[in-house]
Curated annotation (Swiss-Prot):
Contains 2 disulfide bonds. GO terms for biological process: killing of cells of another organism; lipid catabolic process. Keywords: Cytolysis, Dermonecrotic toxin, Disulfide bond, Hemolysis, Lipid degradation, Lipid metabolism, Lyase, Magnesium, Metal-binding, Secreted, Toxin. This is Dermonecrotic toxin LgSicTox-beta-LOXN8. Its main location: secreted. Its EC number is 4.6.1.-. Expressed by the venom gland. Its cofactor is Mg(2+). The keyword Kinase does not apply. Binds 1 Mg(2+) ion per subunit.
Amino acid sequence: ADSRKPIWI
């Protein structure tokens, strides 16, 4: 949901 960081983090 947080587009500022990669989904795997």
